Amino acid sequence: MVASFSWRLLSPRFLGGFVLGAAASSASCVAALQLYDKREPELAPVAPEEKDPLEEYGFPLTGTEARQYINHALAYDPAKRTPKWVIEHLSRTKTVGSADRKHCKFKPDPNIPKMFSATNEDYLGSGWTRGHMAPAGDNKFSTEAMAETFYLSNIVPQNYENNAGFWNRMEMYCRDLTKRFEDVWVVSGPLELPTSHEDGKKRVTYEVIGADEVAVPSHLYKVILVREKGSEQPLAIGAFVVPNSPIGFDHQLPEYKVQLEDLEKMSGLLFFPQLDRDKGLKPLCDVDSCRLIQLHEFKLYIAARRVGGARNLQKLERILSELKEEGITPDGYLLDLYEKKRKEFSLKSGTDRDERKG
């Protein structure tokens, strides 16, 4: 029996099984040791991060972060209830269309907290008009975009003659630039500039209006950047500062030209910060006329707007009659509008007669 057992012990099958078993056992041990070595180390408890007492309840919010709308963006000054700056992009396609300001109303911006917003009542009886920084006329392509320009976050108290006159002519000039340039960017805003007093000191003082004490600016500014079709780099830039007071038609835009750096010092703003100013950027008035329309041209423009809004033939005829009394000859554009409107009234009158007969 011993011999039989010895034979079995020395048999290849037994030895092979032993070797395989031993190898498997050894492998299992090695694997176990490896798994043991790979165990996640026990982490020491992390002490809670100490908060700086300065930050415990947050820093004051200025409310001047940029707010974006369909075709303009702005930074709002909640203390003065006016914008600090308003930027817009103009192109030929945006300044034409069927959008009409008669469907728009001035109202508080729903994005501005009520406690920081101006209201229409602030302007009522104040002697100041509600002056657009991004004008409604730059958004003929979209009724919604035009309506957003009537938010009071885009409005400053403005002298009536300035708003309807020189500032309006500046806005018209910006729109006219889209006929000569592919892209036009305009940044507009209010300024409260210091004045010298008898004691030799300079002071910043400004009127406030209404229960919300909306700040009346002493000056207004525009920065105009233009780019030609097919170009990646803008061609020219111009900066202008005008007083918030009447300016007659005998004045032209170059009279109010300032260095961009000077305006940046006045406003505390850096305009177009991603613009490379070293790449051959030219002064706007060197590459374009900077010419604002003259009085007779302006009256033709106003007459054309009145023709479009005329509600009967009598009012339509009166518009042309008043122009002739002032010695102004209607241009082709105005006469075309007049004829189109007159035909509309004639057609409506004929339809009304037919309905009465029926």
Swiss-Prot record:
| Residues binding a divalent metal cation | N163
> Residues in the active site?
H132
Q: What is its main location?
A: mitochondrion
Question: GO terms for biological process?
Answer: apoptotic DNA fragmentation
Record's GO cellular component, any one? Answer: mitochondrial inner membrane
Q: Where in the cell is it found?
A: Mitochondrion inner membrane
- EC supergroup of this enzyme: hydrolase
Q: Which cofactor does it need?
A: a divalent metal cation
- EC code(s) of this entry: 3.1.30.-
- What are the record keywords, sorted? Endonuclease, Hydrolase, Membrane, Metal-binding, Mitochondrion, Mitochondrion inner membrane, Nuclease, Transit peptide
Against Pfam families, the record matches this protein to: Endonuclease_NS, Exog_C
Task: Determine the domain of life of the protein's source.
Answer: Eukaryota
Q: SUPFAM superfamilies attached here? A: His-Me finger endonucleases
Q: Does the keyword Transit peptide apply?
A: yes
One example of the protein's molecular function in GO is: nucleic acid binding
Q: Write out the similarity annotation.
A: Belongs to the DNA/RNA non-specific endonuclease family.
* Role, per record: Endo/exonuclease with nicking activity towards supercoiled DNA, a preference for single-stranded DNA and 5'-3' exonuclease activity.
Q: What else is known?
A: The active site contains 1 hydrated divalent metal cation that has only 1 direct interaction with the protein; all other interactions are via water molecules.
What do we know about how this protein assembles, alone or with others?
A: Homodimer.
Q: What is this protein called?
A: Nuclease EXOG, mitochondrial
Native source species: Xenopus laevis
Q: Which gene encodes it?
A: exog
